[in-house]
Amino acid sequence: MSQSDYYEVLGVGRDADENELKKAYRKLAMKYHPDRNAGDTKAEERFKNIKEAYEILSDPNKRAAYDQFGHAGLNGGMGGAGAQGFSDAFSDIFSDLFGMRGGGRSSVHRGADLRYNLEITLEQAARGAETQIRIPRQEVCDTCHGSGAKPGTSPKTCPTCNGHGQIRMQQGFFSIQQTCSHCQGSGKVVSDPCGDCHGAGWVKRQKTLSVRIPAGVDEGDSIRLTGEGEAGANGGQAGDLYIVIHLASHPVFQREGNHLHCEIPISFTVAALGGEIEVPTLDGHARIKVPAGTQTGKIFRLRSKGITGVRNQSTGDLLCHVAVETPVDLTARQKELLEEFESISQKDGSRHHPRAKSWMEKAREFFAE
């Protein structure tokens, strides 16, 4: 037992009445409660002293003994009539700390948010679009206007919790509140339910909504429609609808941020001799000059031919990746010409095929080691 002066511990005078004691105790207990001072041993010790002081001074018999004889007059006992007063006060503190004071939970609840996955084309993402979607959701019953009761009647106060929505369970010094199982926390019960919603206050319906897709949206972006989620309970506001964007695969382009990529196959003759080719863009077509000797993997960048982002408003590029295509199903004449070309190239192949020469030199060095 602490030997501190109990009146000083609570910060009250020796003539303090019951209300002053309780007010001082509640204020100090909330300040030094272990749940608010995790790991603070000094606060924990202070809390124990505060609890001990209030238990003694809130019991008239113990307080009288303490006032006359000090700590010696207590004889170690901490039970007796004051325990109930301590329990009530401590349960008030516990309720304040964990948000359980007052008339139980509010019966007004916000509706749940909904998620809808929307697949769009690359063109829709780039240019923006407007589309319609159908979603199943809870809506307030038009017949009972959300009360759940048959028209002409109204919900009654729950007799189990007296309308609080919660019931209090006493366990030793602690008082724990639990949701009332009779009214499920609403504080009301419906004895004559609505025939359309069967007492729920809401019905399930298919809702058609128009959705405007802003230009530049990307995979995983979401569009929030406020108030288009599930209906709230007992007058609570509706939740929100989150539309999550997914991009359908495109036959030509692949998106990377605001940039677009595409593969451009060219013949080996165009690659060798050079030329001009036409490539697709989101807006139509563009022409590219291919220099002689172009190899597979060469990238041609078309500035500002990508997508304008929805957030930063910067426009990406179109990157065209060259793939030199080897001809197949050759005619006899084509084979003859290629064989003639190969024969001529053999005389000075290193000049015409610099990469092959470099590779051969590296291979010889490797095997020579």
Swiss-Prot record:
Which cofactors does the annotated protein need, by name?
A: Zn(2+)
Chain residues that bind Zn(2+) 2: 158, 161, 180, 183
Write out the GO cellular component annotations.
cytoplasm
Start and end residues of the CXXCXGXG motif repeats are: 141-148, 158-165, 180-187, 194-201
Instruction: Print the domain comment field.
Output: The J domain is necessary and sufficient to stimulate DnaK ATPase activity. Zinc center 1 plays an important role in the autonomous, DnaK-independent chaperone activity of DnaJ. Zinc center 2 is essential for interaction with DnaK and for DnaJ activity.
Task performed by this protein: Participates actively in the response to hyperosmotic and heat shock by preventing the aggregation of stress-denatured proteins and by disaggregating proteins, also in an autonomous, DnaK-independent fashion. Unfolded proteins bind initially to DnaJ; upon interaction with the DnaJ-bound protein, DnaK hydrolyzes its bound ATP, resulting in the formation of a stable complex. GrpE releases ADP from DnaK; ATP binding to DnaK triggers the release of the substrate protein, thus completing the reaction cycle.
Q: What protein family does this chain belong to?
A: Belongs to the DnaJ family.
Tell me the protein's name: Chaperone protein DnaJ
Give the species this sequence originates from.
Answer: Nitrosomonas europaea (strain ATCC 19718 / CIP 103999 / KCTC 2705 / NBRC 14298)
Gene symbol?
dnaJ
